């Protein structure tokens, strides 16, 4: 097969590991900078051009769309889909998961546990908004934030009101979320491919920081997840319509809670922490799906 890896960062560990996994299974891997693609949108033969050449002959793509280019990245993935190319994560699912509010509403609709979350537009909604999620301490998140950036812990009601007023004053869209104190600044990252959790690790934030993102200095360790956590992670991925995803889970006094579903999860941290390859299962899944499409067999994930 000819597999395209959509990534702005060809030298990144995640990109290189995906290339290696494709090649080790006998496939041609082509790294494509998403932003350098341009599209011919028509009703007869839609196409994508790249650096002066039309992209042809691809069987599948693995989208690694950075959050900052979600709109254009999804347009490129959608164009590949129009050309009959299989996308490991399709454009609609990526867009769903990137919209934090919509993602939480989808989880809520499916009855999947998550922290109590509030969303508001007007400053005079603030006092009731804070009470709605259980009062301070609480977490305030920018809807557009990634990798722990734009996430603030407000220890008191006064601090919460000040931060919310400041964000809303800047016309920023925010979520207000209950703080799960018993998680102690840690979460569990599950790497899901299809209907399987391939690997999982516990991420612990640096001392004094409630955010556990490895990009912010957190550390990872191998963890054994429960059957409930495994089932919940898979259900969360299915709720988004994704195939490959990282699911972040908080352990709370009322059971596991889904914090986020990431459509382009980091690969380096979880592979180096667990010693498990997560890239080969991605390629194996693509092989199964492309083969089933060609033979019109029922697809069993």
From Swiss-Prot:
The gene is rimK2. Mn(2+) 1 binds at residues 248, 260. Mn(2+) 2 binds at residues 260, 262. Pfam families: RimK, Rimk_N. InterPro entries: ATP-grasp, ATP-grasp_RimK-type, ATP_grasp_subdomain_1, RimK, Rimk_N, Rp_bS6_RimK/Lys_biosynth_LsyX. Mg(2+) 2 binds at residues 260, 262. It comes from Shewanella baltica (strain OS195). Mg(2+) 1 binds at residues 248, 260. Residues 104-287 form the ATP-grasp domain. PROSITE patterns: ATP_GRASP. Gene3D superfamilies: 3.40.50.20, ATP-grasp fold, A domain, ATP-grasp fold, B domain. ATP binds at residues 141, 178-179, 187, 211-213. PANTHER family: RIBOSOMAL PROTEIN BS6--L-GLUTAMATE LIGASE, RIBOSOMAL PROTEIN S6 MODIFICATION PROTEIN. Its cofactor is Mg(2+); Mn(2+). Belongs to the RimK family. Binds 2 magnesium or manganese ions per subunit. Keywords: ATP-binding, Ligase, Magnesium, Manganese, Metal-binding, Nucleotide-binding, Protein biosynthesis. It comes from the Bacteria. One of its GO terms (biological process) is SOS response. One of its GO terms (cellular component) is cytoplasm. This is Probable alpha-L-glutamate ligase 2.
């Amino acid at each position: 097969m000819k597999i395209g890896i959509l990534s702005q960062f060809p030298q990144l560990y995640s990109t290189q590991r995906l290339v290696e996994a494709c090649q080790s299974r006998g496939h041609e891997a082509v790294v494509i900078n998403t932003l350098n693609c341009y599209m011919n949108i028509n009703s007869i033969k839609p196409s994508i051009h790249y650096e002066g050449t039309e992209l042809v002959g691809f069987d599948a793509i693995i989208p690694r769309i950075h959050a900052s280019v979600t709109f254009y990245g999804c347009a490129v993935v959608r164009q590949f889909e129009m050309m009959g190319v299989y996308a490991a994560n399709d454009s609609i699912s990526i867009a769903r998961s990137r919209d934090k509010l919509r993602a939480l509403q989808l989880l809520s609709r499916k009855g999947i546990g998550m922290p109590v979350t509030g969303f508001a537009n007007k400053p005079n909604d603030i006092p009731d908004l804070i009470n709605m999620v259980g009062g301070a301490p609480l977490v305030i998140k920018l809807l557009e934030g990634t990798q722990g950036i734009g996430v603030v812990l407000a220890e008191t009601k006064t601090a919460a009101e000040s931060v919310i007023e400041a964000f809303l004053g800047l016309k920023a869209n925010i979520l207000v979320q209950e703080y799960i104190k018993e998680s102690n600044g840690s979460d569990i990252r599950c790497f899901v491919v299809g209907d399987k959790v391939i690997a999982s690790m516990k991420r612990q934030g640096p001392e004094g920081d409630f955010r556990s993102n490895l990009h912010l200095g957190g550390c990872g360790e191998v963890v054994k997840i429960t059957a409930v956590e495994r089932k919940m992670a898979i259900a969360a991925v299915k709720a988004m319509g994704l195939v490959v995803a990282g699911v972040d889970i908080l352990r709370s006094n009322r059971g596991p809670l889904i914090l986020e579903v990431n459509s382009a999860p980091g690969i380096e941290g979880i592979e180096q922490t667990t010693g498990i390859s997560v890239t080969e299962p991605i390629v194996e899944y693509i092989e199964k799906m492309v083969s089933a499409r060609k033979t019109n067999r029922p697809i069993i994930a």
